[in-house]
UniProtKB/Swiss-Prot annotation:
It is found in: Cell inner membrane. InterPro entries: 2C_sensor_his_kinase, HAMP_dom, HATPase_C_sf, His_kinase_dom, HisK_dim/P_dom, HisK_dim/P_sf, Sig_transdc_His_kin-like_C. The lineage of its organism: Bacteria, Pseudomonadati, Pseudomonadota, Gammaproteobacteria, Enterobacterales. This is Sensor protein RstB. It comes from Escherichia coli (strain K12). GO terms for molecular function: ATP binding; phosphorelay sensor kinase activity. Keywords: ATP-binding, Cell inner membrane, Cell membrane, Kinase, Membrane, Nucleotide-binding, Phosphoprotein, Transferase, Transmembrane, Transmembrane helix, Two-component regulatory system. Residues 158-210 form the HAMP domain. It is a multi-pass membrane protein.
Amino acid sequence: MKKLFIQFYLLLFVCFLVMSLLVGLVYKFTAERAGKQSLDDLMNSSLYLMRSELREIPPHDWGKTLKEMDLNLSFDLRVEPLSKYHLDDISMHRLRGGEIVALDDQYTFLQRIPRSHYVLAVGPVPYLYYLHQMRLLDIALIAFIAISLAFPVFIWMRPHWQDMLKLEAAAQRFGDGHLNERIHFDEGSSFERLGVAFNQMADNINALIASKKQLIDGIAHELRTPLVRLRYRLEMSDNLSAAESQALNRDISQLEALIEELLTYARLDRPQNELHLSEPDLPLWLSTHLADIQAVTPDKTVRIKTLVQGHYAALDMRLMERVLDNLLNNALRYCHSTVETSLLLSGNRATLIVEDDGPGIAPENREHIFEPFVRLDPSRDRSTGGCGLGLAIVHSIALAMGGTVNCDTSELGGARFSFSWPLWHNIPQFTSA
């Protein structure tokens, strides 16, 4: 609100200031023109008075004579020697030319008496002093108006700002996965129509997600059913050799794995994910899981590099198992002989690291490997197995848990994947669509 208030207030104040300056310039031009005319008339009248009243009096007695005259003026009118005033060259030239010269610091005007070394001095003039004071008053008035403008601007902006905060909070909650979030503004609010549009958008997104879920469930049923029938018929067939039967079973298993990965990715790639939280002994779970992996892959070395004991807060172990399996499968697929795993605990974050001694991943490709169906050539392609969704699923799980996943170079020479997540107990729990 502070930034918006300052922007709007400055715009309003600058517009007001420009208009005031324009009006002031017009007024100043008019006032100065009228004042100059009045001053000329005053000086001419004074000179005429001097010619008529002081004609027979010597110049050195003019000042004394003027003092004795009762002119009933609000300012002094006196005759003084020109040498009394130390003027700059420009002012002196103007004065000798018969022009009126103003002494701003003394609020006095001077005009040379023709054919003499005397000047007619008028002042101090109260009007000039008043004009000087008016300048100070103008500055004070502008400052007062500037302060006065801030109050109505704040009063006008406050309800709008509250509605904006309300809309921002609703949009933030909706973006965090609370898809039932709706917003309602008071009748007459400037944001009422925007609130209606937001609610319509939310309803449409909810309907789209529900339709997507229904489509995924339908695809799962329609694809799995013929695969089950195909596997059953394959088992019942006597016309295939053992090698052919084994090859077909392998192809069917790959199709089933691909379907399962696609469905898993589709379920994760949405703003709502139902997290089933528990507080397991994560170091024990990791040790047990790696022992099982080592048992089924005796030709590779799968070991723990670093294991930090501690409390790892609440986790969805179903998702954590998928993360570990996908990272280990990826490492085992491309390693030469060794895969190392670490579990670290630092402050309010935990990190699961899986690294291998394989060919590694070039820096320019590390941002793209978490996209679905991305394969890297020549060492990481379809010939090594997999469907190209494993790391994309890991990335989606990281987003669901409020964490991150990245890739860099391992000390073993291959790729090093780091899956990091916050240790907050308030990990967002979303309701399923």
